[in-house]
UniProtKB/Swiss-Prot annotation:
It comes from the Bacteria. The keyword Signal applies. This is F17 fimbrial protein. Transmembrane segments: none annotated. Pfam families: FimA. Disulfide bonds join C37-C77. Keywords: Disulfide bond, Fimbrium, Signal. The keyword Disulfide bond applies. Belongs to the fimbrial protein family. GO terms for cellular component: pilus. It comes from Escherichia coli. It is found in: Fimbrium. SUPFAM superfamilies: Bacterial adhesins.
Length: 180
């Protein structure tokens, strides 16, 4: 009897796999390029000092103030003909400070200002960078690799999520250099 149950079990297992059928196929494509640029020493760990502003200037949700430019300097960039990469930008990595709803950085200062975040923007100071998104959806402008040195220009500003209160504002974000 045990022999029959064993054989029936084997037959059942074999026949169940025969009923599986593929519903589709996924193909993955990518490209690996030489690292075409190096971040300069002074750009590796930046500190961007935002201006001191009045809490009144951030009196309601969506208000922004204190637009402050910053740059990431790259050196030793190879030409696109050598590497296959023609453009470069910073990809701002999501972390514990990322507000996935607004796409901004939350304030991590102890006893800091409330209802205040830090918003990153492209060089134009208008188009917001949406943190917490995939690279293509972050809306980060790319820069052509035309020279051995490339400057990536961005901006940061205060962003109100409600009526702001006074206090310090601090946050951090890591970045990776991405090539296209």
């Amino acid at each position: 009897m045990q022999k029959i149950q064993f054989i029936l079990g084997i037959l059942a297992a074999a026949s169940s796999s025969a009923t599986l059928a593929y519903d589709g196929k996924i193909t993955f494509n990518g490209k690996v390029v030489d690292q075409t640029c190096s971040v300069t020493t002074e750009s590796k760990n930046l500190t961007v000092k935002l201006p001191t502003v009045s809490a009144n200037s951030l009196a309601s949700s969506g208000k922004v103030v204190g637009l402050t430019p910053f740059t990431i300097l790259l050196e030793g960039c190879n030409t696109p003909a050598v590497t296959g990469a023609q453009n470069v930008n910073a990809y701002f990595e999501p972390n514990a400070n990322t507000d996935y709803t607004t796409g901004n950085l939350t304030n991590t200062a102890s006893s800091g200002a409330s209802n205040v975040q830090i918003q990153l923007l492209n060089a134009d100071g208008v188009k917001a960078i949406k943190l917490g998104q995939a690279a293509a959806a972050q809306s980060v402008d790319t820069v052509a690799i035309n020279d051995a040195n490339v400057t990536l220009r961005y901006n940061a500003q205060y962003y109100a999520t409600g009526v702001a209160t006074a206090g310090d504002v601090t946050s951090t974000v890591n970045y990776t250099i991405a090539y296209q």
